[in-house]
């Protein structure tokens, strides 16, 4: 038999930190609604796992708006004993949490971002959304295979568009 080291999940209860911008200090219904909807889905998933005999301690934190730093939360020690951290939303918050997760060896799940940045090489960071750059070749290859003789016209909104590399690859 192979002797294994105990993992952070061996004590029977998983300590989860959820860090999202609920924006409790301002009125932003669209952004707040998106976070509340995600959180409700998270709680439904946790409830289902509880029904399968998994035990959770869920700690929820409001990260605030993007200009707010997470230093006070990180320095408070509230995250030190978490088994997993879910969040945040804004890139600057993700960077702060990524450094913390690496230092403390706590897995960080980023549910919203799909941007390739310095967190991409952090072994403690897990992205839920697939990076667009990692699927671009498959999408364009399949399109060209399926529609080899198609005359395609792309209409691009040059103000909001970030699809230039996709369009050029087609």
What are these regions (language model features)?
Residues 1-20, 27:
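Pro/Ala/Gly-rich low-complexity, hydrophilic intrinsically disordered segments
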């Amino acid at each position: 038999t192979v002797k294994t080291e105990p993992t952070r999940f061996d004590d029977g209860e998983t300590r989860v930190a959820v860090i999202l911008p609920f924006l409790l200090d301002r009125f932003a219904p669209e952004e707040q609604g998106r976070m509340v909807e995600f959180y409700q889905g998270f709680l439904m998933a946790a409830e289902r796992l509880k029904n399968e005999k998994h035990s959770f301690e869920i700690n929820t934190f409001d990260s605030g708006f993007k200009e707010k730093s997470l230093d006070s939360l990180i320095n408070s020690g509230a995250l030190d004993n978490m088994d997993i951290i879910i969040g945040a939303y804004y890139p600057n918050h993700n960077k702060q949490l990524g450094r913390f997760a690496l230092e403390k060896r706590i897995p960080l799940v980023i549910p919203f971002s799909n941007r390739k940045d310095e967190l991409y090489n952090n072994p403690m960071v897990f992205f839920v959304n697939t990076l667009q750059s990692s699927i671009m070749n498959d999408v364009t290859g399949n399109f060209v295979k399926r529609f080899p003789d198609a005359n395609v016209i792309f209409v691009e909104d040059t103000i909001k568009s970030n699809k230039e590399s996709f369009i050029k690859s087609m």
